[in-house]
Amino acid sequence: MKIAFKNFLTTLRRYKASSLLNVAGLTMAFTAFYVIMVQVWWELGYNRSIPDAERIYLVAPSGFWDKSGNSFAAQSPRPSCERLVERSPEIEAGGPLRAWFNTQPAWVMRNGDYVRMKLKVITASTGFIETMRATAAAGDLTDFVRPNTLLLARSEAERMGVGVGDAVWLADNPFRAAEVRPDRQYEVVGIYDDFPANSGLAEIEAMVDIGDDGMNEPNTWNDTFFVRLREGTDPAAIARRWSEINAEVQAAWAAKMRPLWIEQYGQEEVDSWDNDDDQTGCRLMPLSELYFERALESSHWNPGSRPTTLSLLAVALLVVAIALINFVNFFFALTPARLRTVNIFKVFGAPTASLRFSFLFEAAGFVLVSLLLSWYVASALRSTLLAEYISTSLALTDNLDVLLLETGVALAAALAAGIYPAWYITSFNPALAAKGSFAGSRGGRRLRTTLVAVQYVVSIVLIVFTFFCYAQHRFERRFDLGFEREQVLTFDAPRKIAAQPQSYEALVSRLAADPRIEGVTASQSPFVSDASTVWGRKWKGEEVDVHVRMVRPNFPEVMRIPMLEGGLRPEHGRDSIYHAIVPRSVADRFDFRPGEIVDNYISIAGISGDLQFRPLQYETKPLMMIADNKATRIVYLRIAPGSDIEDVCDGIRRAIGEVDPDNKAPDIRFMNEQIDDLYEKENRLMTVIALFALLAVVIALMGVFGLVLFETQYRRREIAVRKVMGATTDEILAMFNRRYVVITLVCFAVAAPAAWWGVERWLSGFAYRVPVSPWIFLAALAAVLAVTVATVTLRSLSAARSNPADAVKSE
């Protein structure tokens, strides 16, 4: 061991430049591996740290959205789910939560005064608490079934400074309350340990009891229902049972409602419904897999993208592979210089096994030094911008599992990279070894070329993928949504303005005085969003499910939505029936015509051009824009081009302060920024992939640099002879570049199909995507050729300009 350690130190001293290049490359690779794997580990472990997550399932019906079996709802009718739990001995526990993760005002008492705070409160049942095995930090979690009681997460209780028995006041309406209501006092009866941060339950800061809410509404889908199954239970069988139970519940409810429907719609219309297939499909989706479940229509439970996560994992492994190839090339580059030393040891009786162990120890030494340096670099990255692109902490102590995995990968890599070179260099017959030169042998050249080719293939694949990431991001930003989103500012209205239409009108009148503001409108929720309210109605014998956006009557005008027929008028927002605008594709699909009345209370007021109101990961759905003067939560303002935006925003804040002086000024943003937020996660991960793909290319070029260094050293005599025979510097440079240009072209031919396959798989996760253009592949080839020629030229230039006499003398 001592001799092996001394040999390792000797290698570091004797080959400083090559050793430094390899340590630098491995350090960068292991740093990239750690950072990427922290993110990948977080995503692959999403929801899995919840106790028995593999046996907890979401009840996800399909009938409300479509009956194709390709799309499932996160919400379900509570009566059918509760009856499923009652009839299924295979279910250990089950219960609903109303997963509306909205921040609402909450007040606590401090020195006799109400102190306003913010809190995310959801309604849930004791069955839900039992299903998730929530643990009590204080109090009794089952006590919240009593009226006016609530449970708090431990972190929120500490932040608010309250404990069991203390009082918290909640708003009666989370969207409209601005003042504390003394009669809305809740007693804290239990404090539970926070749910895991990498889970869909992490946002639950407080819970109140759902009681019997929804138990008499079998056609209302408001509740997210989870069940925990016993070991060995078939979830598909439970899903089929739910469909049967739901059909019974719906049939009983329809029989009860039939007289009212006949009175409202007529006997003939109601009789036509009897032929409908009301059997609603269902899937039980495991909680541990929800993060990547694209069949689930949800804006909360499935934020992950499996192709993106797998792409991250692939980049992490490929970066390490490229660095290890550099190491192997480095080892073989030293073979000619070290062969004589090895054979001297063998002549003097050194065991071959001992020599091989020494070389393996050397490989492990390089890897471990690089690994330790990478951990230092990773720790330093915690305070950099890169940390903001990772969903969790980069601290080493917070990611011990990743450290263990990386250490195992590093040691396995050291063994894999060192075992063949160690065997090879000790395999020569001592009497024959001095006669040949591995540096100039055909086998040596072939091996080095193959290793470099692998690096090039990987690098080209990563560059192509990075270019397509950028192209998809650019495509999303420029996608035509069907309205003019440029020059539009937006903000969340303060509570008084959101709650009182007259306050909104007062704000609009003040803003109208600014000639730079061309129009003001509002909606009840963000117009472009992954969350929707969905209405299901009967129309001409067909079940019509539409996504609803409640908007002010002038919304199409301000947003410059092209109207093909009809339109909204100011009085439409206050009529006794709703007035709706539908896009052309929706009108054609359901045969809507202006002036028709849907379900006796929705009048089709007009038809617009097609609109994209959801992120591009999702296919568009049928849309109705319904006029409502009470839709004042999200305000939109169209600004004249060339306006001083900061000055306009200051004027908006002053106007808000005049109307609602008790609330702080809102955050005013461009609508494009709000839309970009919908792609924030994908964009963050794309940036990480691009950064480390670039790093992989840099490491590969370091390998090329080292290989050219090796070749120029061992071809000095050839270069000298060529120069004596009249070769110019440019011709010498062309000789070196020609080989690497050919290698690049051959590698591109291999990499292009692999890159095409990977890009197609990744883009399949988007409903709207860029085409796989050959120009991007050619751009990647041009980029690789450019940096290769630059690298080879830079390194071989000194050899090409050297004095031939010096080379001949040294030989």
Where are the predicted features?
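Membrane-helix entry/capping segments
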Residues: M1-F5, T10, R14, S18, ...
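Intracellular coupling helices
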Residues: F5-A17, L21, G25, A323-F366, ...
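Hydrophobic alpha-helical transmembrane segments of multi-pass inner-membrane transport and secretion
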Residues: R14-W41, G304-R340, L368, L447-Q472, ...
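Alpha-helical transmembrane segments
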Residues: L21, M28-S62, L381-I390, V458-Q487, ...
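Membrane-proximal extracellular/periplasmic loop immediately following the first transmembrane helix
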Residues: I36-W107, V115, D213-G214, W221-F226, ...
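Mid-to-C-terminal secondary-structure elements
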Residues: S125-A137, L152-G304, A506-K681
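Small-residue-rich transmembrane alpha-helices
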Residues: R283, A363-P430, V461, A471, ...
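Hydrophobic alpha-helical bundles that form the membrane domains of multi-pass transporters
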Residues: E297-A387, D401
